Amino acid sequence: MLGLHVGTLISLSLCILLEPVEGSLMQPCQPINQTVSLEKEGCPTCLVIQTPICSGHCITKEPVFRSPFSTVYQHVCTYRDVRYEMIRLPDCPPWVDPHVTYPVALSCDCSLCNMDTSDCTIESLQPDFCITQRVLTDGDMW
């Protein structure tokens, strides 16, 4: 009985000691300001802006035993509440609609990745990647 009690105290103490370390290393799932690029086929430049996106750590569990009959679902930091804003890209030809809509994160949540609204890949391009010439929102070129 004493061994069980001592083992429990050691486990509890270890959890209490490790909790602040883990909390300080991983940011929670929340909106953060991020530089992103907006571009559209037919327009010669991409616009670089700052907007809130969802980013941070979500607790996930990896099963010890993997069954071929079950699926493992991992939670990711994704949009809970989102607003869409529209911006006009500069220098688009007259036959191309210069307006681009982009999401603005109002709140975030750890949930399954929705491929309709999020980039669910393991490795993707950075959010500020541009194929065309970059223009800052103040008009300067990169």
From Swiss-Prot:
<feature type="signal peptide">
    <location>
        <begin position="1"/>
        <end position="23"/>
    </location>
</feature>
<dbReference type="InterPro" id="IPR006208">
    <property type="entry name" value="Glyco_hormone_CN"/>
</dbReference>
<dbReference type="Pfam" id="PF00007">
    <property type="entry name" value="Cys_knot"/>
</dbReference>
<comment type="similarity">
    <text>Belongs to the glycoprotein hormones subunit beta family.</text>
</comment>
<keyword id="KW-0325">Glycoprotein</keyword>
<keyword id="KW-0372">Hormone</keyword>
<keyword id="KW-0732">Signal</keyword>
<dbReference type="InterPro" id="IPR029034">
    <property type="entry name" value="Cystine-knot_cytokine"/>
</dbReference>
<dbReference type="GO" id="GO:0007186">
    <property type="term" value="P:G protein-coupled receptor signaling pathway"/>
</dbReference>
<comment type="function">
    <text>Involved in gametogenesis and steroidogenesis.</text>
</comment>
<feature type="disulfide bond">
    <location>
        <begin position="113"/>
        <end position="120"/>
    </location>
</feature>
<dbReference type="GO" id="GO:0005179">
    <property type="term" value="F:hormone activity"/>
</dbReference>
<feature type="disulfide bond">
    <location>
        <begin position="54"/>
        <end position="108"/>
    </location>
</feature>
<dbReference type="GO" id="GO:0005737">
    <property type="term" value="C:cytoplasm"/>
</dbReference>
<dbReference type="InterPro" id="IPR018245">
    <property type="entry name" value="Gonadotropin_bsu_CS"/>
</dbReference>
<protein>
    <recommendedName>
        <fullName>Gonadotropin subunit beta-2</fullName>
    </recommendedName>
</protein>
<comment type="subunit">
    <text>Heterodimer of an alpha and a beta chain.</text>
</comment>
<feature type="disulfide bond">
    <location>
        <begin position="58"/>
        <end position="110"/>
    </location>
</feature>
<feature type="disulfide bond">
    <location>
        <begin position="43"/>
        <end position="92"/>
    </location>
</feature>
<keyword id="KW-0964">Secreted</keyword>
<dbReference type="GO" id="GO:0005615">
    <property type="term" value="C:extracellular space"/>
</dbReference>
<dbReference type="InterPro" id="IPR001545">
    <property type="entry name" value="Gonadotropin_bsu"/>
</dbReference>
<feature type="disulfide bond">
    <location>
        <begin position="29"/>
        <end position="77"/>
    </location>
</feature>
<feature type="glycosylation site" description="N-linked (GlcNAc...) asparagine">
    <location>
        <position position="33"/>
    </location>
</feature>
<keyword id="KW-1015">Disulfide bond</keyword>
<feature type="disulfide bond">
    <location>
        <begin position="46"/>
        <end position="130"/>
    </location>
</feature>
